[in-house]
């Protein structure tokens, strides 16, 4: 991995894999003077490298990862499968969600058992480019899966395949279980670490399924939060004097109906020759009542308004007498 100092590819100006990027995503070091030497030895010991969603366009600079068995490169901008012969021990490779158009350069990975190429741009299926060691393969989201007898052709070409596009190859699971039972009876020594590979892959597939469900749940949660914000913004209280959209008639609450103008005018204590009749209405509610069209017509009877001048004249005559 010497010479990989910049994340920019020299040919196309794209983003490629570098020591710095691998270290940033997969390693943590205390600050000291021997950091570069420690980083070199630690990179050599890495077995799992995660470089998903980094905008990577080119696969390169993996020569220093001698013990690598799991490589996560999903969600990048990779267009070509290349430069993987330097990691022959690779068993797990995720290239989902890239821009890959054809399957190539995978025969240099004799130990590859899990390959995820879902959500790419693969149109033509080249079955002779897949390693025979594959146990789990995912090509969903590519147009090549629409060709006739796609599933049958892939299963026939890969004799060890146990799962295709998230669907188990049932006949092989059943036959393998029977073979495993008979093998344990005839050769009990083979039930140890030699046959532990399938259990590892089951756990690996379950972990990927959990990650998928977690991402879907997170996206759903964000969507629901956005939906909850919308009614909060639209159901804000109206400003005084502003009617609701689509409401042509003024609405009167029970509290407003009790504090109407006729009660204050017809009350003997409120009537006076010097002061105009008024009602005790809160300032905000008063603006709302008088700002709406037709409030006075609907809440103040004409007879009660007309009685106010006559009451004043009667009081004036009595004072003269």
Swiss-Prot record:
Entry keyword annotation includes Hydrolase: no
Domain called LRRCT: residue spans: 142-184
Phosphoserine: modified positions: 175, 182
Pfam family, one: LRR_9
Main location: other
Chain segments annotated as coiled-coil in the UniProt record: 198-222
Region Disordered: start-end pairs: 235-321
LRR repeats mapped onto the chain: 45-66, 67-88, 89-110, 111-132
The keyword Transcription regulation belongs to this UniProt entry's keyword annotation: no
GO cellular component terms, semicolon-separated: sperm midpiece
An example Gene Ontology biological process: sperm flagellum assembly
Keyword set, alphabetical order: Cell projection, Cilium, Coiled coil, Differentiation, Flagellum, Leucine-rich repeat, Phosphoprotein, Repeat, Spermatogenesis
Subcellular locations according to the entry: Cell projection, Cilium, Flagellum
InterPro entries in the cross-refs: Cilia_flagella_integrity, Leu-rich_rpt, Leu-rich_rpt_typical-subtyp, LRR_dom_sf
Signal peptide (UniProt feature, chain positions): none
Domain of life: Eukaryota
Role, per record: Required for normal spermatogenesis and male fertility. Plays an important role in sperm flagellum biogenesis.
Name of the molecule in the record: Leucine-rich repeat-containing protein 46
Organism: Macaca fascicularis (Crab-eating macaque)
């Amino acid at each position: 991995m010497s010479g990989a100092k910049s994340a920019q590819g020299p040919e196309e100006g794209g983003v490629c894999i570098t020591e710095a990027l691998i270290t940033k995503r997969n390693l943590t070091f205390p600050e000291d003077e021997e950091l570069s030497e420690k980083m070199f030895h630690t990179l050599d010991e890495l077995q799992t490298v995660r470089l998903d969603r980094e905008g990577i366009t080119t696969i390169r600079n993996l020569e220093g990862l001698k013990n690598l068995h799991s490589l996560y490169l999903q969600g990048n901008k990779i267009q070509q499968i290349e430069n993987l012969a330097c990691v022959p021990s690779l068993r797990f490779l995720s290239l989902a969600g890239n821009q890959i158009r054809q399957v190539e350069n995978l025969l240099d990975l004799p130990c590859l058992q899990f390959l995820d190429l879902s959500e790419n741009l693969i149109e033509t299926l080249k079955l002779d480019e897949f390693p025979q060691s594959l146990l789990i393969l995912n090509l969903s989201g590519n147009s090549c899966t629409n060709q006739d007898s796609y599933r049958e052709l892939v299963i026939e070409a890969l004799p060890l395949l146990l799962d295709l596009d998230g669907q188990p190859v049932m006949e092989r699971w059943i036959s393998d279980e029977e073979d495993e039972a008979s093998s344990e009876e005839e050769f009990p020594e083979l039930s140890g670490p030699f046959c532990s590979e399938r259990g590892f892959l089951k756990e690996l597939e379950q972990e990927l399924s959990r990650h998928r469900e977690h991402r879907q749940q997170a996206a759903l949660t964000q969507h629901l939060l956005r939906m909850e914000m919308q009614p909060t913004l639209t159901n804000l209280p109206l400003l005084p004097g502003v009617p609701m959209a689509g409401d042509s008639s003024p609405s009167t609450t029970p509290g407003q109906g009790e504090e109407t103008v006729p009660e204050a005018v017809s009350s003997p204590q409120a009537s006076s020759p010097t002061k105009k009749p008024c009602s005790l209405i809160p300032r905000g509610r008063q603006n709302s009542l008088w700002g709406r069209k037709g409030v006075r017509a609907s809440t103040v009877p004409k007879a009660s308004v007309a009685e106010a001048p006559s009451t004043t004249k009667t009081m004036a005559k009595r004072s003269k007498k």
